[in-house]
Amino acid sequence: MIQQESRLKVADNSGAREILTIKVLGGSGRKFAGVGDMIVATVKQAIPGGNVKKGDVIKAVIVRTVSDVRRADGSYINFDENAAVIVKDDKSPVGTRIFGPVARELRDNDYMRIVSLAPEVL
């Protein structure tokens, strides 16, 4: 589960390396976010020449979490790290590549562009 002040790895080539969660979007007083949820974050580490700079306030969608995600068939999936992809307001990614696997739950939340760019969907 991702909450305010959580730090996440960025799984795309937008130029950011690490982000810090400012707010979980979707409802008043919502505390936690899981795979497929949108967050507002700030860039904490960035590489030179990237599309985003350190200190930028961005929106991102969570693609991997360490905590378990329960599926409809009763199975669970988790990952080794918490990771997100920086997106625009229309849910399209800022970067042109996605690194690492992403969860299948993104397909249910209409992030088809992220799913199509990902090398593996679990």
Swiss-Prot record:
Q: Which SMART domains match?
A: Ribosomal_L14
Gene Ontology molecular function: large ribosomal subunit rRNA binding; structural constituent of ribosome
Per UniProt, what is one Pfam family of this protein? Ribosomal_L14
A single Gene Ontology CC annotation of this entry is: cytosolic large ribosomal subunit
Q: Where along the sequence do coiled-coil regions lie?
A: none
Q: Which UniProt keywords apply?
A: Ribonucleoprotein, Ribosomal protein, RNA-binding, rRNA-binding
Name its GO BP terms in alphabetical order.
translation
What PROSITE patterns does this protein map onto? RIBOSOMAL_L14
List the InterPro entries hit by this protein, alphabetically: Ribosomal_uL14, Ribosomal_uL14_bac-type, Ribosomal_uL14_CS, Ribosomal_uL14_sf
The family database entries (HAMAP family) matched by this protein are listed as: Ribosomal_uL14 (MF_01367)
Query: What is stated as this protein's family in its record?
Result: Belongs to the universal ribosomal protein uL14 family.
- Database matches in NCBIfam families: rplN_bact (TIGR01067)
Q: Which PANTHER family match?
A: 50S/60S RIBOSOMAL PROTEIN L14/L23, LARGE RIBOSOMAL SUBUNIT PROTEIN UL14M
Complexes and interactors: Part of the 50S ribosomal subunit. Forms a cluster with proteins L3 and L19. In the 70S ribosome, L14 and L19 interact and together make contacts with the 16S rRNA in bridges B5 and B8.
Q: What does this protein do?
A: Binds to 23S rRNA. Forms part of two intersubunit bridges in the 70S ribosome.
Name the chain's protein.
Answer: Large ribosomal subunit protein uL14
